[in-house]
């Protein structure tokens, strides 16, 4: 039987190591590897992912799927998914909404998640056999049951292009909610749902590494995480919410 508590400690250690490295480089002149359309990549993204992968590999034999460097080897039943810096644009512009995100997957299901909000030294974590926590404090999803009382967090993925009709449908959906937020980090959006700060996160065409850890933590917090339409490049459609709005 998989020892999820032990793997959780490994993921927490790697996330903290990655987050501390990012903090050490915050405010420095950063090398931009790619700036195209709505997407941007830093050398720091790649360097941080390498550090996290080394930490995970030194303590486990699972393969690793990373945003920046792809697969370490063929995927097995269990594998790590890593986003070394979710919210790169925010980080580059000194907007303190970014994080390190690490998930353990069983086939296509996130079973463990760690998200380190290094800007505030907040560590979120949980797995399928545990509660969800912010540092040492348990967190749970909210009890709001109506959209017109609730907050939706969403986004427009950098590599997704919406038709006019799709944009129209999105705006129509926004009108059902009390508040709508776009914060530039899918992982942080998921955490807001897990911690009861928002009721729903949804985004189509988002990459798996941005939402996998959040999915596991939302479910550990008593919520519902739906990941559908997984594509060959690991884009997915994600909806995370509380129990009331899932029905």
Description of each model-found segment:
Residues 1-85:
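N-terminal subdomain of lithium-sensitive/metallo-dependent phosphomonoesterases centered on the IMPase/IPPase/PAP
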Residues 134-138:
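A structural micro-motif at secondary-structure boundaries
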Residues 74-133:
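DPxDG-like acidic metal-binding loop motif
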Residues 141-247:
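An extended, acidic
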Residues 45, 67-68, 83-86, 90, ...:
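Acidic active-site catalytic centers that drive phospho-/nucleotidyl reactions
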Residues 22, 45, 56, 88, ...:
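Residue-level signal for inorganic ion chemistry
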């Amino acid at each position: 039987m998989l020892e999820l508590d032990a793997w959780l400690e490994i993921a927490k250690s790697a996330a903290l190591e990655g987050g501390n490295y990012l903090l050490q480089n915050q405010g420095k002149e950063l090398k931009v590897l790619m700036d195209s359309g709505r997407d941007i990549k830093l050398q720091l993204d790649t360097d941080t992912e390498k550090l996290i992968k080394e930490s995970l590999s030194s303590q486990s034999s699972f393969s690793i799927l990373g945003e920046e460097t792809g697969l370490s080897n063929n995927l097995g039943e269990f594998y790590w998914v890593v986003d070394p810096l979710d919210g790169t644009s925010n980080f580059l512009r000194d907007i303190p909404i970014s994080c390190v995100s690490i998930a353990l997957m069983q086939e296509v299901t996130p079973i463990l998640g760690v998200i380190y909000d290094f800007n505030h030294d907040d560590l979120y974590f949980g797995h399928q056999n545990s509660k969800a926590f912010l540092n040492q404090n348990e967190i749970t999803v909210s009890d709001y049951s109506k959209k017109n009382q609730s907050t939706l967090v969403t986004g427009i993925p950098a590599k997704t292009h919406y038709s006019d009709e799709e944009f129209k449908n999105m705006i129509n959906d926004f009108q059902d909610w009390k508040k709508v937020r776009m914060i530039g980090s899918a992982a942080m959006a998921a955490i807001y749902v897990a911690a009861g700060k928002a009721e729903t996160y949804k985004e189509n065409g988002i990459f798996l590494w941005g939402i996998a850890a959040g999915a596991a933590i939302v479910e550990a917090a008593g919520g519902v995480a739906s990941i559908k339409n997984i594509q060959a490049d690991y884009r997915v459609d994600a909806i995370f919410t509380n129990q009331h709005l899932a029905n």
